[in-house]
Amino acid sequence: MKNTALTNIHESLGAKMVPFAGYNMPVQYEGVNAEHEIVRTGVGVFDVSHMGEFFLKGENALALIQKVTSNDASKLVDGKAQYSCLPNNEGGIVDDLIIYKIADNHYMLVVNASNIEKDWNWISSHNDLGVDMQNLSDSYSLLAIQGPKAAEAMQSLTSIDLVNMPYYSFQIGEFAGLKDVTVSATGYTGSGGFEIYFKNEDAEAIWNKIFEAGKPFGIKPIGLAARDTLRLEMGFCLYGNDINDTTSPLEAGLGWITKFDKEFTNSANLKKQKEEGVARKLVAFEMQERAVPRHDYEIVDASGNVIGIVTSGTMSPSMNIGIGLGYVPTSFSTVDSDIFIRIRKNDVLAKVVKLPFYKK
């Protein structure tokens, strides 16, 4: 089991620690609902240092990225980031990731913790272009400072203009007195904020300065359980639940990051799938009575026939209703369609809705 550079701090704060993707991670501090509310209304900090960071350099770096990812990275300018995925050869997804363009011929790829080795091997196997690849996942820490008060709370720590930083842009500069910190206007919560990347040896110093600066704003540490409820209220996919090596980006509602004006892994088959239409789709649904849908619960039709499976589900802390995502036949995927979730032998009515669940 790996620790992050901040494990001792989490333990000293009384965090409940659990194994996640091979790491000892804080799942909650004072409680999921309270932590969720802090991020929706104020500012909270997640240690997500388990995520992976790959650096690609060289004149063919973009060509390699274009070959293995579904989105069009040629559209990136320096200081911009892009959400994308790594399609496999079978019509599924190796991983979803964020691509950062640091400069021409210099990129950072941020991948899911559970897929670091798999992604590294996958991209390496396609690197016949002489691209210099470095896996620095074990050297970098990552904090997500999220919430509507994040910019204001952190502004005293940097000369980077946080308030006016466009979504999915980033700058590398001084933060909390440390140089070469990557400050990115990204996140997995839907409440705004930043993700900051820095060397492990700076982790405790940065953590302490963040909490000092954020104290007047009621800043709190947040665990992975609230990270999950926050992302689910936005309908953001979680790899391993909502997307995996058998789900196509088109089935998962990720057509917007699948660009067919270039060739990439399995693009011909995915293009054909787009033209012919998909047989199943990932839908968002809200329970119509008080009930909590959970991962792997069956989705059934009005006659009780199993038509799909819940991939993610929870009781929404912001809305106080059961919400979830799951794959159903395309005929059940239109908004307002009635579906039923099988919860301990009871089939409970749910309605297909448009994302996000949580409207600010």
Curated annotation (Swiss-Prot):
Q: Which PANTHER family match?
A: AMINOMETHYLTRANSFERASE (PTHR43757), AMINOMETHYLTRANSFERASE, MITOCHONDRIAL (PTHR43757:SF2)
**Catalysed reactions listed for this entry:** N(6)-[(R)-S(8)-aminomethyldihydrolipoyl]-L-lysyl-[protein] + (6S)-5,6,7,8-tetrahydrofolate = N(6)-[(R)-dihydrolipoyl]-L-lysyl-[protein] + (6R)-5,10-methylene-5,6,7,8-tetrahydrofolate + NH4(+)
> What Enzyme Commission number(s) appear in the record?
2.1.2.10
Residues folding into a coiled coil are none
GO cellular component entries: cytosol; glycine cleavage complex
A GO BP entry: glycine decarboxylation via glycine cleavage system
Pfam families assigned to the protein according to its UniProt record, in alphabetical order? GCV_T (PF01571), GCV_T_C (PF08669)
Similarity remark: Belongs to the GcvT family.
Output this protein's name: Aminomethyltransferase
Ordered alphabetically, the record's keywords are:
Aminotransferase, Transferase
Organism whose genome encodes this protein: Flavobacterium psychrophilum (strain ATCC 49511 / DSM 21280 / CIP 103535 / JIP02/86)
Q: Which SUPFAM superfamilies match?
A: Aminomethyltransferase beta-barrel domain (SSF101790), Folate-binding domain (SSF103025)
Binding partners and assembly: The glycine cleavage system is composed of four proteins: P, T, L and H.
Tell me the InterPro entries matching this sequence: GCS_T, GCS_T_bac, GCST_C, GCV_T_N, GcvT/YgfZ/DmdA, GcvT/YgfZ_C, TrmE/GcvT_dom1
Molecular function per GO? aminomethyltransferase activity; transaminase activity
> Domain of life here?
Bacteria
Function description: The glycine cleavage system catalyzes the degradation of glycine.
